[in-house]
Swiss-Prot record:
The gene is ligA. Its cofactor is Mg(2+); Mn(2+). NCBIfam families: dnlj, PRK07956.1. CDD domains: LIGANc. It comes from Synechococcus sp. (strain WH7803). The lineage of its organism: Bacteria, Bacillati, Cyanobacteriota, Cyanophyceae, Synechococcales. Pfam families: BRCT, DNA_ligase_aden, DNA_ligase_OB, DNA_ligase_ZBD, HHH_2, HHH_5, Nlig-Ia. It comes from the Bacteria. This is DNA ligase. NAD(+) binds at residues 35-39, 84-85, 123, 146, 183, 302, 326.
Length: 698
């Protein structure tokens, strides 16, 4: 059954918005939304992908925990990964989680019987910044940001300035090592004092305590951190398996252990006997949260018994034994100022409402997406309308409703323009589609989007070519197609704003290097409608070059729909794309500047081996952990898969090898426990080269 085009476009939009938000939060250190916005948007994408698994793309934020560490601090690998939490937004979702937990624990009651009671701990979900603290022999040796869950940034010098974090544990004797997780924050009264001091110095004010805390933790000068008086609440404890001291057997005992060790634990945590008590605890704090001296955005619920936690285990992203129950999102009234439009890579025109700034959960909001013409018509927006804005379910907040009783006399209805705001071409809306599009292939906005997609991480992965530089290149007419990127030289680039000779040289080199990217990445980079990273890999595995793919798309579409996971909509999209003369010209231009648009000999051989089960690593499963000396994880994975192997995210008895680098985490410990062979990078390379008799096992 084909997926409605509107759902596919919505999923693509959600992926783009969520990934952009994650990049702003984790890499740029410039958060642009509150958690409730991200949570609801993430849930919408999760529901879409659950209903239509074909929508899952490799770049979907649901496939990962999170984002990459920013530059400027040393990257470190966490001894024990930091997982995300699944979210619930209602009592029904809370009970759904609890029912699933009972099923996993084989405690599901007979049909019609009441749910058995399991003790849980309710903790306030502090709206701060997660930290991972490492103690060796009782001494704080490292503090790191959460990062992507596996790797974070070493900010030990800054964290040492937080008075509520002990530099030495209050234990005698201490365990050989202790891992503590908790939340750094700036209390509201401290935040008010900081902003008052900044105002007196005529400095920009911080938007909210969370942003101020995040920026403070990444200050290069620890004296600045000390002056801002951060606080910390501990909530998770990890101890060595072989420690002979008194070991907590429950989450409640873990919190008491942390208190005894010298940590500040949030005093509002509660031991709750059943799920009804959890609902009462949540409702109580939902009404009382504004009385606290710090922000909270929900309640974290954890199964109390640690043995049951171990039995419940983890999904790929989150523990099954815990959930975050989130407070409802906020709403606020504002006055509509004007309607603007954005043009995306595929030509879709999205209306955006601009209104008087309002504060929602500590952030200033002045724009909200209206999605499409149907939503615009449904809201019946007029100039000057009073609107209700909500930060929920959207990265760019949404207009929830209009208050027509407050509409100014003579206000005119707002409609989508008939012409593209970027190029002036007539806009088109196909029958049955919600989207309105610009179909001018020379539209600057479409070209800019196509260029951003081509150089993105999942495609050609060109470092140093950001959105602002792309806009300059397009505005000056220096780049009129993707192929023109490969005609840029250092002299031309240095004529642009903020582009020095070194940066220009690096960009030219990065573009040259991108010519060697695999055929699947080149195919994905073309931006063909419906062809995401996963589909591009499937197509590239079946068709070794653009010529054979184009021939199949135009002459033999059944050869495409016969592929697993490739439906008629993708086949039709490919047929339309390859039949378009402008795209045929683009392929010729790309070949003229050195792009092969084909699999290399090595790729073809590896593909043939995999398809025939002849790869010498066929049937072998690998797990990667730690930082390898010269290979990134993606490079190591590509090499393993190229030789027929499979890469997994978790260690089990079925794992063939664990490849361990520096600061390998719990996966290495589990490999040793299970007796799984462990390789270093050199051994991996020898194994890939089919010299298994000489490999070095760690």
């Amino acid at each position: 059954m084909s997926i409605p085009q509107g759902l596919q476009e919505r999923a693509a939009e959600l992926r783009q918005l969520l990934n952009r938000a994650a990049h702003a939060y984790y890499v740029l250190d410039a958060p642009d939304l509150e958690d409730s916005v991200y949570d609801r948007l993430y849930r919408e994408l999760l529901d879409l992908e659950a209903a239509h698994p074909e929508l899952v793309e490799a770049d979907s934020p649901t496939q990962r925990v999170g984002g990459s560490p920013a530059e400027g601090f040393r990257s470190v690998t966490h001894r024990i990964p930091l997982f995300s939490l699944d979210n619930a937004f209602s009592a029904e979702e809370l009970r759904g989680w609890y029912t699933r937990l009972l099923k996993v624990l084989d405690r599901e009651p007979p049909s019609g019987s009441p749910l058995p009671a399991l003790a849980m701990v309710g903790e306030l979900k502090i709206d701060g910044n997660a930290l991972a603290l490492s103690y060796d022999n009782g001494v704080l040796v490292r503090a790191a940001t959460r990062g992507d869950g596996d790797q974070g940034e070493d900010i030990t010098a800054n964290v040492r300035t937080i008075a509520s974090i002990p530099l030495r544990l209050h234990l005698d004797p201490p365990p050989a090592w202790v891992e503590v997780r908790g939340e750094a924050l700036i209390p509201d009264n401290t935040f008010a004092a900081i902003n008052s001091e900044r105002a007196a110095r005529d400095e920009p004010l911080f938007a909210n305590p969370r942003n101020a805390c995040a920026g403070t933790l990444r200050q290069l000068d620890p004296k600045v951190v000390a002056a801002r008086r951060l606080d910390f609440f501990a909530y998770t404890l990890h101890l060595p398996e072989d420690w002979s001291g008194e070991r907590p057997t429950s989450q409640w005992e873990s919190l008491r252990w942390l208190e005894d060790a010298g940590f500040r634990v949030n005093p509002n945590a509660a031991l709750l006997p059943d799920v009804d008590s959890v609902e009462q605890f949540f409702g109580d704090w939902d009404s009382r949260r504004h009385d606290l001296n710090y922000a909270t955005d929900g309640v974290v619920v954890k199964l109390n018994d640690l043995r049951l936690q171990d039995a419940a285990g983890f999904t790929q992203k989150a523990p099954r034994w815990a959930i975050a129950l989130k407070y409802p999102a906020e709403e606020a009234p504002s006055r509509l100022l004007k309607l603007t439009c954005q043009v995306g890579r595929t030509g879709v025109v999205t209306p955006v409402a601009e209104f008087e700034p309002v504060s929602l959960a500590g952030t200033s909001v002045s724009r909200a997406t209206l999605h499409n013409a149907d939503r615009l018509q449904e809201l019946d927006l007029h100039s000057g309308d009073t609107i209700i804005v909500r930060k929920a379910g959207e990265i760019i907040p949404e207009v929830l409703r209009v208050l027509p009783e407050l509409r100014p006399e003579g206000a005119l209805p707002l409609e989508l323009p008939q012409q593209c705001p970027s190029c002036g071409s007539d806009l088109v809306r196909e029958s049955g589609e919600a989207a309105t599009r610009c179909v001018n292939s020379s539209c600057p906005a479409i070209l800019s989007g196509a260029l951003r997609h081509w150089v993105s991480k999942g495609a050609l992965d060109v470092d140093g070519l950001g959105s602002k530089l792309i806009e300059q290149l397009v505005e000056r007419g220096l780049v009129r197609s993707i192929a023109d990127l490969y005609r840029l030289d250092t002299a031309l680039l240095t004529s642009l704003e903020r582009m020095g000779e070194k940066s220009a040289g690096n960009l030219v080199a990065a573009l040259a290097q991108s010519r060697t990217q695999p055929w699947s990445r080149q195919l994905y980079g073309l931006g063909i409608h419906h062809v995401g990273e996963v589909n591009a890999k499937a197509l590239a595995s079946a068709f070794a070059d653009a010529h054979s793919l184009a021939d199949a798309a135009v002459q033999r579409p059944e050869a495409i729909t016969d592929l697993h996971g490739i439906g008629p909509e993708i086949a039709q999209s490919l047929q339309q794309w390859f039949n378009t003369s402008a795209n045929q010209d683009l392929l010729q231009q790309l070949r003229a500047v050195g792009l092969t648009l084909a699999a290399s000999d090595q790729e073809r051989q590896a593909l043939a081996d995999r398809n025939n089960g002849k790869g010498h690593l066929n049937g072998q499963t690998f797990v990667l952990t730690g930082t390898l000396p010269s290979l990134s994880r993606s490079q190591a994975q590509a090499l393993i898969e190229g030789a027929g192997g499979k890469v997994s995210g978790s260690v089990s008895k079925k794992t063939s090898f664990v490849v361990a680098g520096d600061e390998a985490g719990s996966k290495l410990d589990k490999a040793n426990t299970l007796g799984v062979s462990v390789l270093d990078e050199a051994a991996l390379m020898l194994l890939i080269q089919n010299s298994a008799d000489t490999i070095h096992l760690l």
